Amino acid sequence: MFDFQINAHCSHTRARVGCFRTPHGSVNTPRFMPVGTLATVKGITATQLADTGAQMVLANTYHLHLQPGEGIVADAGGLHRFMGWDRPLLTDSGGFQIFSLADLNRIDDHGVVFRNPRNGSQIELTPERAIEIQMALGADVAMAFDQCPPYPASESDVETACKRTHAWLERCSNTHQHANQALFGIVQGGCFPHLREQSAQIVASFGLPGIAIGGVSVGEPVEDIHRIVRQVSPLLPQDRPRYLMGIGTLREIAIAVASGIDLFDCVLPTRLGRHGTALVAGERWNLRNARFREDHTPLDQSCTCTACRHHSRAYLHHLIRNEELLGLTLLSLHNLTQLIRFTSAISQAIQDDCFSEDFAPWQPDSAAHHTW
């Protein structure tokens, strides 16, 4: 039911091209996954999302548990039918949101107790419960419940979070029984190399269909992200997809691909779009800027998104300045298309064995600007 096949390697880096097969179709890697927190990528229909080239979408267990509840989603026939998306889906465990957003009342080895932000009631979430919720949601991939330490955190606190994450992974693995759903484990360890190495080895020992690197992009310097990815990726099984959580800039994606990462997700492209910002040739353009008022050219002549095929910069500027919802949707679609085109271009470069040359300007030791 689940299979990951590597089809090409870069001869100069660890970059690779693969295909992750799921019950709802295949995901060609490397691949960026749009974030559909509440079973929707904000302001975008499933048909529009498919037109961006998206092959897999991430939804949020924490938020869906609070509203509408996994029971309603299950009664609808699962998350795919509920949101009208017939391609692969991934649900996170909710751990990151609980530890970063929720009003925590208790955390211990058993699980966490937090206050429902909607009605003030107390909710207990354990590894078993997190998996039960995700099985009810029915995505193709479920993520293990983990403890994501903040940045900065002491070595002692990060070590405690790692031990808890590994113990919880065992409980998640024992609870997970869903033939049409793959369980991914999550490597933690903060910015401490020995804890990252230990976590990678322990999580890999479970033999799960895929592994994620978590606890990055939580406030640490980007140099630490690069170092963590370069260290951890080679320690993970070669024949399983590797997922770097919460990364969504072109530079960080290119650097991570060079280290052998396959999957990425981030709210950044749609969040930027909703705030009137477009990603163009690696830059961020604020469409509220007056310089676009009389510019009747497309955002990007080479882009295939709806905004670039049918509308001008002047029109998008007009929509954004007047707070028209269509403008936010068009920019979100454009930004997603840019990220997905970027990973597709990387994939082709790896297959042509020119990734290290074509994407060299994106690497940490280069200050050059690259257009594509």
From Swiss-Prot:
<dbReference type="Pfam" id="PF01702">
    <property type="entry name" value="TGT"/>
</dbReference>
<feature type="region of interest" description="RNA binding; important for wobble base 34 recognition">
    <location>
        <begin position="270"/>
        <end position="274"/>
    </location>
</feature>
<feature type="binding site">
    <location>
        <begin position="92"/>
        <end position="96"/>
    </location>
    <ligand>
        <name>substrate</name>
    </ligand>
</feature>
<dbReference type="InterPro" id="IPR002616">
    <property type="entry name" value="tRNA_ribo_trans-like"/>
</dbReference>
<dbReference type="GO" id="GO:0008479">
    <property type="term" value="F:tRNA-guanosine(34) queuine transglycosylase activity"/>
</dbReference>
<feature type="binding site">
    <location>
        <position position="188"/>
    </location>
    <ligand>
        <name>substrate</name>
    </ligand>
</feature>
<dbReference type="GO" id="GO:0005829">
    <property type="term" value="C:cytosol"/>
</dbReference>
<keyword id="KW-0479">Metal-binding</keyword>
<dbReference type="InterPro" id="IPR004803">
    <property type="entry name" value="TGT"/>
</dbReference>
<dbReference type="InterPro" id="IPR050076">
    <property type="entry name" value="ArchSynthase1/Queuine_TRR"/>
</dbReference>
<dbReference type="InterPro" id="IPR036511">
    <property type="entry name" value="TGT-like_sf"/>
</dbReference>
<dbReference type="GO" id="GO:0002099">
    <property type="term" value="P:tRNA wobble guanine modification"/>
</dbReference>
<feature type="binding site">
    <location>
        <position position="303"/>
    </location>
    <ligand>
        <name>Zn(2+)</name>
    </ligand>
</feature>
<feature type="binding site">
    <location>
        <position position="305"/>
    </location>
    <ligand>
        <name>Zn(2+)</name>
    </ligand>
</feature>
<dbReference type="GO" id="GO:0008616">
    <property type="term" value="P:queuosine biosynthetic process"/>
</dbReference>
<keyword id="KW-0862">Zinc</keyword>
<comment type="subunit">
    <text>Homodimer. Within each dimer, one monomer is responsible for RNA recognition and catalysis, while the other monomer binds to the replacement base PreQ1.</text>
</comment>
<feature type="active site" description="Nucleophile">
    <location>
        <position position="265"/>
    </location>
</feature>
<keyword id="KW-0328">Glycosyltransferase</keyword>
<feature type="binding site">
    <location>
        <position position="334"/>
    </location>
    <ligand>
        <name>Zn(2+)</name>
    </ligand>
</feature>
<feature type="binding site">
    <location>
        <position position="308"/>
    </location>
    <ligand>
        <name>Zn(2+)</name>
    </ligand>
</feature>
<feature type="active site" description="Proton acceptor">
    <location>
        <position position="92"/>
    </location>
</feature>
<feature type="binding site">
    <location>
        <position position="215"/>
    </location>
    <ligand>
        <name>substrate</name>
    </ligand>
</feature>
<keyword id="KW-0671">Queuosine biosynthesis</keyword>
<protein>
    <recommendedName>
        <fullName>Queuine tRNA-ribosyltransferase</fullName>
        <ecNumber>2.4.2.29</ecNumber>
    </recommendedName>
</protein>
<dbReference type="GO" id="GO:0101030">
    <property type="term" value="P:tRNA-guanine transglycosylation"/>
</dbReference>
<comment type="function">
    <text>Catalyzes the base-exchange of a guanine (G) residue with the queuine precursor 7-aminomethyl-7-deazaguanine (PreQ1) at position 34 (anticodon wobble position) in tRNAs with GU(N) anticodons (tRNA-Asp, -Asn, -His and -Tyr). Catalysis occurs through a double-displacement mechanism. The nucleophile active site attacks the C1' of nucleotide 34 to detach the guanine base from the RNA, forming a covalent enzyme-RNA intermediate. The proton acceptor active site deprotonates the incoming PreQ1, allowing a nucleophilic attack on the C1' of the ribose to form the product.</text>
</comment>
<feature type="binding site">
    <location>
        <position position="146"/>
    </location>
    <ligand>
        <name>substrate</name>
    </ligand>
</feature>
<dbReference type="GO" id="GO:0046872">
    <property type="term" value="F:metal ion binding"/>
</dbReference>
<keyword id="KW-0808">Transferase</keyword>
<feature type="region of interest" description="RNA binding">
    <location>
        <begin position="246"/>
        <end position="252"/>
    </location>
</feature>
<comment type="similarity">
    <text>Belongs to the queuine tRNA-ribosyltransferase family.</text>
</comment>
<comment type="pathway">
    <text>tRNA modification; tRNA-queuosine biosynthesis.</text>
</comment>
<keyword id="KW-0819">tRNA processing</keyword>
